Amino acid sequence: MAAAANLEDVPSMDLMNELLRRMKCSSKPDKRLILVGPPGSGKGTQSPIIKDEYCLCHLATGDMLRAAVAAKTPLGVKAKEAMDKGELVSDDLVVGIIDEAMKKPSCQKGFILDGFPRTVVQAQKLDEMLEKKGTKVDKVLNFAIDDSILEERITGRWIHPSSGRSYHTKFAPPKVPGVDDVTGEPLIQRKDDTAEVLKSRLEAFHKQTEPVIDYYSKKALVANLHAEKPPKEVTAEVQKVLS
């Protein structure tokens, strides 16, 4: 059992702000969301807004896998064994790590799943896990956008590594070029944010993930967003869909 957090050294203002945040969140409806869309479609821009607005936890499977491996949890140990052998981590392991993450207090009002499921089999396994918990996916937000628009978006993208905040030299520039607005720390460009890598990733997306959209469409859960619009207009669409 994890040791209880020592709150005595936490500044009173921080405690009050967190208490007020939780009181505000208590009146929000529970939501379990999946974000689907090709790289550069705006998921990374919208997910923090959705997370804060609806008091959800953001579950990025890649980050969770790395955290589980680093923490040497039972599932993390199994995942590391697969990685060390050069194997893909099994769908059951990933779903298990999502299951564990959902037990955190920050996930009590629901979650945003980003980067999973990527295949219909993964979607089915996720549904089975949620059904055992007496819950289900409420909405799948499909960030629909034409491939031709994505190259300009991708090659101009800059990231703040520790927070995940994303910027764009043309569409959403930081106040100071190359610097995060909040912390003042330097921004980076991902190594795979190139036209060549984008083409490969789009081919994989269309082949693997579009059947997932069809799977959830048959359950009447998919909301198609006009992801080519400016971020504020996409945010307004999201709010309308989730209201």
Swiss-Prot record:
Q: Where is this region: NMP?
A: 60-89
One Pfam family cited in the UniProt record for this chain: ADK_lid
GO CC entries = cytoplasm; mitochondrion
Q: What residue spans carry the region label LID?
A: 156-193
UniProt keyword ATP-binding present: yes
Disulfide connectivity for this sequence is none
Where is this gene product found?
Answer: Cytoplasm
Q: What class of enzyme is it?
A: transferase
What GO biological process terms does the UniProt entry carry, in alphabetical order?
purine nucleotide metabolic process
Q: Which residues bind ATP?
A: 40-45, 157
Per the record, the similarity remark reads:
Belongs to the adenylate kinase family.
> What does this protein's UniProt record list under function?
Catalyzes the reversible transfer of the terminal phosphate group between ATP and AMP. Plays an important role in cellular energy homeostasis and in adenine nucleotide metabolism.
PANTHER family of this UniProt entry?
A: NUCLEOTIDE KINASE
| Protein name as annotated | Adenylate kinase 4
Please tell me the species this chain comes from: Oryza sativa subsp. japonica
Q: What is the lineage of its organism?
A: Eukaryota, Viridiplantae, Streptophyta, Embryophyta, Tracheophyta
